[in-house]
Amino acid sequence: MALTATATTRGGSALPNSCLQTPKFQSLQKPTFISSFPTNKKTKPRTKHISAVQSPPSTTKWNLESWKTKPAFQLPDYPDKVELESVLKTLSTYPPIVFAGEARNLEEKLGEAALGNAFLLQGGDCAESFKEFSANNIRDTFRVMLQMGVVLMFGGQMPVIKVGRMAGQFAKPRSDPFEEKDGVKLPSYRGDNVNGDAFDEKSRIPDPHRMVRAYTQSVATLNLLRAFASGGYAAMQRVNQWNLDFTDQSEQGDRYRELAHRVDEAMGFMTAAGLTVDHTIMTTTDFWTSHECLLLPYEQALTREDSTSGLYYDCSAHMIWVGERTRQLDGAHVEFLRGIANPLGIKVSHKMDPDELVKLIDILNPQNKPGRITVITRMGADNMRVKLPHLIRAVRGAGQIVTWVSDPMHGNTTKAPCGLKTRSFDSIRAELRAFFDVHEQEGSYPGGVHLEMTGQNVTECVGGSRTITYNDLSSRYHTHCDPRLNASQALELAFAIAERLRRRRLGPKFSL
């Protein structure tokens, strides 16, 4: 399990040896993976090395600092390098936030999604903040993901892998290193773990001590998530209690109550048949964490050698991904990521060349291990129908196994007449429809969805059944970065996806 694990092992030791060793600045041999990964009847993973594409960046020896020899983008310029090194040295002595075994478990689950046997639900804030850090916010986002998980599992009749953009999603890439207002030019806001969002010189100076605060907030967030996941809150018997107050009297709330009632009836049948509903699988849930691998000094400081496998894991999260702006084949971020054993995501827009994607996957997953690579597409509905088929064919032609996931958020950001950034629910849904259509056309598997969302009753994305208009945006617009789906919109989207998963299972009777 992931967040159902406790702080003690069965043998009673305080912490597992795995992932507790401090970083060693030495060369790491290429990892050797031995896998007996389960497959379905349709697809058998190749385990031999792909020789069709070989890229020079992966031929050099990897170590924890080899990324520093590569071109680095989107990294802040800290004015006090001595202070920076002091903070990083301190962070490198701190306990890991997650354990290597949990990351391996997630990789196995994602391998199932790559073969069409599971579905990834990845969601959370665009960017976590120090100001909005509270137990209620964490609980509400976790709760709506539980609801969405039930809806998707019921529709798809397959396991749902729940991964939060939580407990570490602070840093944000910027299109411009500087921001200008009224003739004043200051460094751009890069996330609370780098600098402050207030538009003044002091706030915008990168402060390395913010990394320590981000670490402690991530630890606290994960601690609460572990408690929710294993302490009874996530038990299926509570399926009727997960509705948020503001979604209760809505169409989505009504649909969810109907589904929850059906789940209750099924559990009642299980009890009557003598099957226990008190089993761990019914009273707990697996929940993993993820964030963009952007602030490399922080990621390096939290990377540990796993004593059970000898591999290096970035113990800041179970899964991390490389963004559109930092996925250069010869870049620092790709160099860092190729040496760690976590499951990895690759954000892909309509600009991605199919051959480049094949090369990037080969650098990051030379052993072609299922679950290692998740390709997260973000390109808008029209581009999705044109570009995605070529990417799928190129990856399949190279014999590579990946989990295909749709991020319908980032390709649909627009500016409202009032000047606020927003996203249209109809556009988000259209991109998801295109994603499923293309995979149906290509005979590949739609493996998951990646959403920027919150459990709060915000008004940041327009549309949905409880229609939010441009005029409504300013009433509860709280995001520090990009607009997020609120709980009602997220649940509505989950029902639409569930119907499409059901269509794949039963035939073309439903439409997204």
Swiss-Prot record:
EC number from the UniProt entry: 2.5.1.54
**Which positions does UniProt annotate for Mn(2+) binding?**
126, 410, 452, 482
Q: Does the keyword field hold Chloroplast?
A: yes
One of the GO BP terms on file = chorismate biosynthetic process
Q: In which tissues is it expressed?
A: Mostly expressed in leaves and stems, and, to a lower extent, in roots, stigmas, anthers, petal tubes, petal limbs and sepals.
Presequence boundaries:
1-57
Q: Name one GO cellular component term.
A: chloroplast
Chain positions covered by the region annotation Disordered: 37-57
Extract the InterPro entries matched here: Aldolase_TIM (IPR013785), DAHP_synth_2 (IPR002480)
Obligatory cofactor(s): Mn(2+)
Catalysed reactions listed for this entry: D-erythrose 4-phosphate + phosphoenolpyruvate + H2O = 7-phospho-2-dehydro-3-deoxy-D-arabino-heptonate + phosphate
What phenotype is described for loss of this gene?
Normal floral volatile benzenoids and phenylpropanoids (FVBP) emission.
Q: Which residues bind substrate?
A: 165, 324-325, 347, 378
Q: How is the cofactor bound?
A: Binds 1 divalent metal cation per subunit that could be manganese.
**Which pathway or pathways does this protein act in?**
Metabolic intermediate biosynthesis; chorismate biosynthesis; chorismate from D-erythrose 4-phosphate and phosphoenolpyruvate: step 1/7
What are the subcellular locations of this protein?
Answer: Plastid, Chloroplast
Q: Which GO terms describe its molecular function?
A: 3-deoxy-7-phosphoheptulonate synthase activity; metal ion binding
Class of the enzyme per the UniProt entry, highest EC level: transferase
Keywords tagged on the record: Amino-acid biosynthesis, Aromatic amino acid biosynthesis, Chloroplast, Manganese, Metal-binding, Plastid, Transferase, Transit peptide
Which Gene3D superfamilies has this protein been placed in? Aldolase class I (3.20.20.70)
Major localisation: plastid
The family database entries (PANTHER family) matched by this protein are listed as:
PHOSPHO-2-DEHYDRO-3-DEOXYHEPTONATE ALDOLASE 1, 2, PHOSPHO-2-DEHYDRO-3-DEOXYHEPTONATE ALDOLASE 2, CHLOROPLASTIC
Function field? Involved in the production of volatile organic compounds (VOCs). Catalyzes an aldol-like condensation reaction between phosphoenolpyruvate (PEP) and D-erythrose 4-phosphate (E4P) to generate 3-deoxy-D-arabino-heptulosonate 7-phosphate (DAH7P) and inorganic phosphate.
User: Quaternary arrangement and interactors, per the entry?
Assistant: Homodimer.
Q: Which family does it belong to?
A: Belongs to the class-II DAHP synthase family.
Name under which the protein is recorded: Phospho-2-dehydro-3-deoxyheptonate aldolase 2, chloroplastic
